Amino acid sequence: MITKDVKEQLIQVSGPENFDDSNAGRLVYSYDATPQYQSMPDAVIAPRNTDEISRILTICSEHRVPIVPRGSGTNLCGGTCPTEGGLVLLFKHMNQILEIDEENLTATVQPGVITLDMIRAVESKGLFYPPDPSSMKISTIGGNINENSGGLRGLKYGVTRDYVIGLEVVLANGDIIRTGGKLAKDVAGYDLTRLFVGSEGTLGIVTEAIVKLVPKPETKKTLLALYENIDAAAQTVSDIIAAKIIPATLEFLDQPTLLVIEDYAKIGLPTSAKAVLLIEQDGPFETVERDMEKIEAICKKGDAVSVQTAQTEEEAFALTEARRSALSALARLKPTTILEDATVPRSEIANMVKAINDIAAKYDISICTFGHAGDGNLHPTCTTDIRNKDEMERVEQAFAEIFEKAIELGGTITGEHGVGEMKAPYLEMKLKKEGIDAMKALKAAFDPRNILNPGKMFAKDARKRVVAER
């Protein structure tokens, strides 16, 4: 609850034009991309700089007002839903690329910068920022940092955490700290930079970031390998890595996903295949040619019924964009789409896909599976209808078993989507009580009044998913 006095203090900081507690204004920021989940904030505020954020947090801390930082709301874990009301903090005024440093190979950016805008800006300088979440046309760098976003290129290049080398962060009490910098080496104290990345706004508010860049790859090449057997496709993934080839992307799609994407994108995908591997390599011309020849041979030896190489950049782009459209394509099928990201060692891909299919059959639900096979990050996606309570109960039970299986195979409940509120009930399955207690101690140290994105990471009831009861 934001009292009249607190409202007046906040408006003094941001100006009345950047504070909104109208019903319409609050409604817009009551939900994110998480299926059928909504919670109203008490107000929305859009500060113009770090100093204003510091003053806002000082006020919120004094009056115990929850505050939820929000980028574009593309997360899939309820991470930016204001579950306990309070204040939603927007970064629409803090959306500048402050510097592209070609000598130190870094970019300094504000959190509201759209991911793809930054990628294009650095590419115009002959540089490359590899993390490429499927939401990059919409998502912000700040959101990527809070979720430690991955993407298709994670196998070769890593994820967001691997590129964030410095941060400006406002703590819960309003203090401003800087971590890291434009440095290749820095072991001064605890690695706070990596701690804040992926913390989902629960430890501090990121107001500026320094990210590492690399030279833009000279060229790239894409191929599509078709399989009549999912096990053969999964084994090919392991065989490629065992051959000491690390592709830029190594994506897996099962037949149900393939059918839906082709109906959506209409680019001539071969829908008769039981599984598809979409593989891209980048780098120097000679290296790409050599690697793709080897990859093609491995695919054929691994019982691929067809291996097709994109003949033009346009064709390669169409294939990659079709893969990125998977969620949009699946979302057309039924009113509710639940996309998860159970992740296993890549040697267990075949076992995990088989388990997902068996679990879907057991509970009589529809699950399409696709994902980043090269790093074991699968996206089992259920199309359903939240109004069908009986089916939703079966969906909940199915995903609980999928997460259990992932952990049994040496994996995790989330590879890149984050925990938020939706996956918090399952976190103890992965970390055990001792791990949760350690995280709670960190949270208490950074945010003793629990005002930073409360209700996220830590579940009130373990293994009771919120989506089933809303």
Swiss-Prot record:
One Pfam family it belongs to: FAD-oxidase_C
Xref: InterPro entries: FAD-bd_oxidored_4_C (IPR004113), FAD-bd_PCMH (IPR016166), FAD-bd_PCMH-like_sf (IPR036318), FAD-bd_PCMH_sub2 (IPR016169), FAD-linked_Oxase-like_C (IPR016164), FAD-linked_OxidoTrans_Type4 (IPR051914), GlcD (IPR004490), Oxid_FAD_bind_N (IPR006094)
Cofactors named for this entry: FAD
EC number: 1.1.99.14
Protein's job: Component of a complex that catalyzes the oxidation of glycolate to glyoxylate. Is also able to oxidize D-lactate ((R)-lactate). Does not link directly to O(2), and 2,6-dichloroindophenol (DCIP) and phenazine methosulfate (PMS) can act as artificial electron acceptors in vitro, but the physiological molecule that functions as primary electron acceptor during glycolate oxidation is unknown.
GO CC field: glycolate oxidase complex; plasma membrane
UniProt keyword annotations, A-Z: Cell membrane, FAD, Flavoprotein, Membrane, Oxidoreductase
Catalysed reaction, written as an equation: glycolate + A = glyoxylate + AH2; (R)-lactate + A = pyruvate + AH2
GO molecular function, one term: (S)-2-hydroxy-acid oxidase activity
Subunit structure: The glycolate oxidase likely consists of several subunits including GlcD and GlcF.
NCBIfam families noted in UniProt: glcD (TIGR00387)
Transit peptide keyword on record: no
Locations listed in the record: Cell membrane
Protein name, entry field: Glycolate oxidase subunit GlcD
Species of the source: Bacillus subtilis (strain 168)
Similarity-based family: Belongs to the FAD-binding oxidoreductase/transferase type 4 family.
PROSITE patterns from the UniProt entry: FAD_PCMH (PS51387)
Domain FAD-binding PCMH-type: 37-216
